[in-house]
Regions:
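HotDog/MaoC-like acyl-thioester-processing domains
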Residues: 63-152, 247, 254-297
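Hot-dog-fold acyl-thioester-processing enzymes
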Residues: 1-52, 111, 121-234, 297
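Short alpha-helix capping/helix-loop boundary micro-motifs
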Residues: 52-57, 236-242
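C-terminal structured interaction module
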Residues: 222, 238-240, 244, 250, ...
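Generic structural detector for well-ordered beta-strands
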Residues: 56, 116-118, 174-179, 240, ...
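Short, structured motif recognition centered on aromatic/hydrophobic residues
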Residues: 35, 52, 67-73, 91-97, ...
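Well-ordered mid-protein domain cores that form the structural environment of catalytic cofactors
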Residues: 46, 55, 61, 68-70
Length: 297
């Protein structure tokens, strides 16, 4: 659905040459789609997901492995009431995803992160008094803090014939825009239970809301087109959704390499990806501001 050309997930021989292990790697975006989908057991009545932060991918996932996620409520905040909308509040969730061992027990950690969901009240007349400080994501990426997640793989097979070395701080726009399609299909495939992604009656203006990870998946696909020497994604420093995305929106992707550091035979990159959506009426909105860390050649 997202068309991600990440080479280590598309090619068995290349994945084996890079990792030194047999078998193909599951795309890290798909790993997080599944994890996020599992976490929606806590947010079926979501209005929107506002942000992700501190996303850390601790190990790669290979085909055939089973994932399990646990969700912890880390904070709740009731929002101010307005006559033109139902009662709502914010829930800060901590998600921990593991691989399942053959005996059914939790195995090694795959991912840890937080996400903030805006939810409808079960009882619109209720007053909860919740007013937790949910904090804010730090957008500044310190690559030194990410070295512990970097793999000890061989980056040489990822190096293209012509080096890919975009100058740090230069904003580059992907010439290939992309149209958002198959949104409910991705939600179903990843067991995302949020009704707003499946039922247009629950969305703003009677339109289905595109799952935020769908936009992120298309943004990662664009990143891998622009930086084809990318081997994997190690995590997301921050990820904000400033406006909703709808099916048939046409997305434009802007990429800025913020920093890079050597790591083993490869390098770490801190990248900012900004996405704009062109609507059916011709208007344009910023819909994603994403700061992530990659490892590659």
């Amino acid at each position: 659905i997202c068309g991600d050309p990440l080479a280590t997930s598309l090619s068995h021989p290349l994945a084996e040459a890079v990792t030194g292990q047999p078998g193909a790697l599951v795309n890290p975006a798909l790993v997080l789609h599944v994890s996020i989908g599992q976490s929606t057991v806590a947010t079926r009545q979501v209005i929107a997901n506002l942000f992700y932060r501190g996303v850390a991918l601790h190990r790669p996932v290979r085909h055939g492995e089973t994932l399990r996620s646990t969700v912890t409520i880390q904070g709740l905040r009731e929002l101010s009431r307005r006559e033109d909308r139902p009662a709502r509040g914010l829930a800060l969730l901590g998600i921990h995803t593991t691989c399942v061992n053959p005996n059914g027990s939790d195995g090694p950690t795959v991912a840890d992160y937080e996400r903030c969901a805006m939810l409808r009240f079960r009882d619109p007349e209720a007053t909860t008094g919740h007013n937790d400080d949910l904090g804010a994501a730090d957008p500044e990426v310190d690559l030194e803090a990410w070295h512990g997640l970097a793999p000890t793989w061989d980056a040489a097979p990822l190096r293209p014939p012509r080096p890919v070395d975009p100058p740090s701080g230069q904003r580059r726009t992907d010439p290939l825009r992309d149209t958002v399609t198959n949104a409910p299909e991705l939600a179903r495939l990843t067991q995302n239970l949020a009704g707003v992604h499946r039922d247009r009656a629950l969305g703003p203006g009677g339109r289905r809301l595109v799952y935020g990870g769908h936009t992120i998946g298309l943004a990662q696909a664009s990143l891998c087109r622009m930086l084809p020497d990318t081997g994997t994604v190690l995590g997301w420093q921050s990820c904000d959704h400033p406006a909703p995305v709808f099916e048939e929106d046409v997305l434009t992707f802007h990429h800025t390499v913020l920093d890079e550091r050597p790591s083993g035979s490869g390098r770490l990159r801190a990248v900012r990806v900004e996405v704009d959506a062109e609507r059916s009426d011709g208007s344009t909105d910023a819909v994603l501001d994403w700061r992530l860390v990659t490892w590659g050649a």
